Amino acid sequence: MEKEGLGLEITELRLGLPGRDVAEKMMKKRAFTEMNMTSSGSNSDQCESGVVSSGGDAEKVNDSPAAKSQVVGWPPVCSYRKKNSCKEASTTKVGLGYVKVSMDGVPYLRKMDLGSSQGYDDLAFALDKLFGFRGIGVALKDGDNCEYVTIYEDKDGDWMLAGDVPWGMFLESCKRLRIMKRSDATGFGLQPRGVDE
């Protein structure tokens, strides 16, 4: 099948950058004698200058402007550099993000943005709105007289009472919030209601 007569040069698949026309003589396999002729001269100098000798005549390889300009996406950016460039932007807001919030007796989890709250009072108001329950704000302010207690998991995996540390430290270390019944919250330094020391 002859390609020249059918005009299939445009649709021919080639290995190389798009928009670069390479002489058809260079695309075909070369015979041993042609390889010896090109290697007899300083082949690397001729290739760098764009002059290719084959059989004694010299011809200039055409480089189109598209081939000279940088191809989009080349050179490939290492995934390590991509991840680190994203981390630099996110490290300015350390700890500010969405955390999971669970409540005892509620069969679903919620997520909330801690960065939107300005302090523990705003957090209590947001949690009240989130679960439609009016006891969470009281639990954060006056934990002794409430049925529920708000605890959080810090970076180390320890569960601590919300409100015991300054707000900035809470934002940096909070990974998860849990609103649990006071009777179930053993081991947090809490006593059941009505029990005096």
From Swiss-Prot:
Q: Where in the cell is it found?
A: Nucleus
Q: Which GO terms describe its cellular component?
A: nucleus
Q: What would be one Pfam family of this protein?
A: AUX_IAA
Mutagenesis / variant outcome for changing G73R: In msg2-2; gain of function. Affects auxin-related developmental processes
Q: Which residues form the PB1 domain?
A: 96-184
Question: GO biological process: any one?
Answer: response to auxin
User: Would I find Cell membrane among this entry's keywords?
Assistant: no
Task: Tell me, using the record's free text, what induces this protein.
Answer: Up-regulated by auxin. Up-regulated by phototropism in hypocotyls, with a higher level on the shaded side.
Location (main, coarse): nucleus
| Origin: domain of life | Eukaryota
* Disordered: annotated span: 35-67
The record's annotation in PROSITE patterns points to:
PB1
Q: Does the keyword Repressor apply?
A: yes
* Residue ranges annotated as motif EAR-like (transcriptional repression): 13-17
Compositionally skewed regions (Polar residues) per UniProt: 35-47
Q: Which SUPFAM superfamilies match?
A: CAD & PB1 domains (SSF54277)
The record's subunit annotation is: Homodimers and heterodimers. Interacts with the auxin response factor ARF7.
Q: Family, per the entry? A: Belongs to the Aux/IAA family.
Name-wise, this protein is Auxin-responsive protein IAA19
Lineage of producing organism: Eukaryota, Viridiplantae, Streptophyta, Embryophyta, Tracheophyta
* The encoding gene: IAA19
